Amino acid sequence: MDKIVSPSKTKAIVEKYKFRFSKSLGQNFLIDQNILEDIVDGADIQPDDCVIEIGPGIGTLTQFIAEKAHKVVAIEIDRNLIPILKHTLADYQNVEVINQDVLKVDLHQLIADKFEGKPVKVIANLPYYVTTPIVMRFLEEKVPVDSLVIMIQKEVAVRMQAGPGTKDYGALSIAVQYYCNPEILLKVPPSVFIPQPKVESIVIKLQVYPEPKVKVERDDLMFALVKDAFGKRRKTLLNALSSGLLQLSKEIVRESLEAANIDENRRGETLTIEEYATLTKEVAARQ
């Protein structure tokens, strides 16, 4: 069938299937061809690439992805959209739609079963409430994907890319930048969606590193230190880390900071990932 990227075609499909938008699922459908093309261009899909699309909606973006990719597996949680997707994607033989929650899918098994060892990329339009759980699942579980191109709420994208010493720098910044290089591709105004969301969106590309940015033997300890350091942003590192969930003594914290050459009066938001890695090594040696 023809591309469905226009306000009139989108509305016609919604009316034909009597589809009701779910606020709880954050459903907003794109209606701007330029934005759709920019997303696909940003993903840099090669003819041999396979794509996992999360939240295909009515298949608007899926149609553009399918024209570039070797194969697309679109994971949609809303069963009411499945009949629509079967209709809008009927002409695309390289697309498979799965009606599941991506947080419950065995992603390693899916990739092994569906993609024949070919390169895998992720493209997604994620509502605010599941952005971090979905992104961190791919990264922490080391799901073998080359990149994630995701459309998310502006504030979350800014936090992912923020650097030390800025107001947006936090635990999410470090977690994302530990595993990948974040690059903001484009801003997306509310006017290019049906219905229009109340927030601005950003398309960000997370290029996954072959290995994490820094070498840390105990990344669980590093992220626990990060959580404690940012949990009490106004406190110095000495006070934040000695009164956090790790229950470290002031003596251990002071010795570890000194060995890592980090001033105990600094705050957590000023440390680089490399400094957190060094601090983790020193704390681990004293636990």
Curated annotation (Swiss-Prot):
* Keyword Metal-binding included in the entry's annotation: no
Which EC numbers does the record give?
2.1.1.182
Report the locations given in the UniProt record. Answer: Cytoplasm
Q: Which organism is it from?
A: Alkaliphilus metalliredigens (strain QYMF)
Q: Where does S-adenosyl-L-methionine bind?
A: 28, 30, 55, 76, 101, 125
Q: Which family does it belong to?
A: Belongs to the class I-like SAM-binding methyltransferase superfamily. rRNA adenine N(6)-methyltransferase family. RsmA subfamily.
The record's function comment reads:
Specifically dimethylates two adjacent adenosines (A1518 and A1519) in the loop of a conserved hairpin near the 3'-end of 16S rRNA in the 30S particle. May play a critical role in biogenesis of 30S subunits.
* Matches recorded under Pfam families: RrnaAD
Q: InterPro entries annotated for this entry?
A: KsgA/Erm, rRNA_Ade_diMease-like_C, rRNA_Ade_Mease_Trfase_CS, rRNA_Ade_methylase_Trfase_N, rRNA_adenine_dimethylase, SAM-dependent_MTases_sf
Protein name per its UniProtKB record: Ribosomal RNA small subunit methyltransferase A
| SUPFAM superfamilies cross-referenced by the UniProt entry | S-adenosyl-L-methionine-dependent methyltransferases
List the GO cellular component terms: cytosol
Q: Which residues form a coiled coil?
A: none
Identify which top EC class this enzyme belongs to: transferase
Query: Which keywords are on file for this protein?
Result: Cytoplasm, Methyltransferase, RNA-binding, rRNA processing, S-adenosyl-L-methionine, Transferase
Catalytic reaction equation(s): adenosine(1518)/adenosine(1519) in 16S rRNA + 4 S-adenosyl-L-methionine = N(6)-dimethyladenosine(1518)/N(6)-dimethyladenosine(1519) in 16S rRNA + 4 S-adenosyl-L-homocysteine + 4 H(+)
**Its Gene Ontology molecular function terms?**
16S rRNA (adenine(1518)-N(6)/adenine(1519)-N(6))-dimethyltransferase activity; RNA binding
